Amino acid sequence: MTSFVSFLPELVLLAGALALFVVTLGQNNVRLARILSVATASGVLVAALATVNHSAVLFSGAYRVDAFSQLLKIAIAFGYLCVGILSGQLRDIRGEAKPEYFLFLALSMTGLLALVSSIDVITLIIALELSSFPLYLMVAMRREREGQRVQMESAIKYIMFGIAANGVMFFGFGYLYGLTGSTSLPVILEKLPPLLSSPLAVTGLALTLAGFLYKLAVFPFHFWTPDVYQGSSNETASLIASLPKLGAVAVLVRFVSLAAPGHETLATLLTCLAIASMVYGNLIALVQTDLKRLLGFSGIAHAGYVMVGFVAMDNFGFASALYYIAGYMLMVLACFVVVCQVSRDGANVAITELAGLHKRSPLLAVTLIVGVFALAGVPPFVGFMAKLNLLTSAWQAGHTALVVLTVINSAIAIYYYLQIVRAAFFAESDAQPAPIALTPSMSALCVLLIVAITLLGVAPAFTIDAITNSLATISTVSS
């Protein structure tokens, strides 16, 4: 019975996915599919909150429910609920595919929930593929515009890069299995650290990390990001930009913690990835005019910020990285709420189209400025506290140069974020733009994101302590 209750979030989500599958078999009932999707997300969030203190090892030791996994499931469920509400209209998804869109959304979330609890290579691979393949299909569901099939180009790029990254990752898993003789992460945790002086062990770990760095869009695994953001629908882009990255960071924490603290080779590799991602993402974002492409290149830079937390290779650094990516999920979702509402008929939004937003919808304007200022690291929002923790962890670990470069890159990023604010609050449109009417659910989502972003920045102690305490369960997996 305890095992059944511990598995409750996944069971609720599977039940919701089954109900959505039944809906897709009948008439094109988009409204019912939308209601079921939001209800499922709400149920998963309640179930995750109810089981936050549960622990269990399931499926012959391949699946572990602990404080670490359950805390992440709460964040994933909250993000799922936000995306479900955000996907209320799906203006740019083909009409006949809209019910299937919500089904694939549920299946992808099922994979993410399984990903954060998987402690065996086999279940990890299954969860990763389950979370990825529905996203490939969701990108391709965008309707054609003026004979262009940009959504198919984006989907093909996403699939091809994804398959290549997964192939490299599986190759790395093969090395780890050959060195340790097991697919169980607890066994690998026990046997791998003494072997890290071996080139094969370092190669295996590096290849394995490559697959998750692809999900996080870390340089040089970032090539797909701006094109997929631009080619997918606004709602799909909001999903790809947020939730999969949370799952990727969670698994990266499990793998990087395999290395002994102070392992110089891995720390140097992570430092190079962090610097390259920050510099490349911020410099290219400076010249973007399409808002989704700007958020895509900005996401590459933020992936570099996350890697700063991993460089410390201790629990404080890992907790800082998790706190940052959870905050980033909220920040980028706030920006995509504005993109979805400003967009005319689901089209991409240029920065200049934000002109007069403070008059068209004051609530959307506030949501945008909170999201953008948080991304820029302006207090009192979560982006400031999260970035401060990352810098502190790297400073304490002796990576002074990395801290300085991170601060410089953060200053560069402020320029293009202020361009967004300037367009929304100070630029005037040539024509008289119509007011943007928000539905009650969309207004509630805006308020929820504003409160969450502000609250996590003003009072971060509870969240950081919860994450830090949950990390202790990773080290006890082998016991």
Swiss-Prot record:
Its main location: membrane. It is a multi-pass membrane protein. Pfam families: Proton_antipo_M. NDH-1 is composed of 14 different subunits. Subunits NuoA, H, J, K, L, M, N constitute the membrane sector of the complex. It is an enzyme of class 7 (translocase). The keyword Protein biosynthesis does not apply. It is found in: Cell inner membrane. The chain crosses the membrane at residues 4-24, 43-63, 67-87, 99-119, 121-141, 159-179, 201-221, 239-259, 267-287, 294-314, 318-338, 364-384, 401-421, 444-464. It catalyses: a quinone + NADH + 5 H(+)(in) = a quinol + NAD(+) + 4 H(+)(out). This is NADH-quinone oxidoreductase subunit N 2. Keywords: Cell inner membrane, Cell membrane, Membrane, NAD, Quinone, Translocase, Transmembrane, Transmembrane helix, Transport, Ubiquinone. NDH-1 shuttles electrons from NADH, via FMN and iron-sulfur (Fe-S) centers, to quinones in the respiratory chain. The immediate electron acceptor for the enzyme in this species is believed to be ubiquinone. Couples the redox reaction to proton translocation (for every two electrons transferred, four hydrogen ions are translocated across the cytoplasmic membrane), and thus conserves the redox energy in a proton gradient. Its EC number is 7.1.1.-. Belongs to the complex I subunit 2 family. InterPro entries: NADH-Q_OxRdtase_suN/2, ND/Mrp_TM. GO terms for cellular component: plasma membrane.
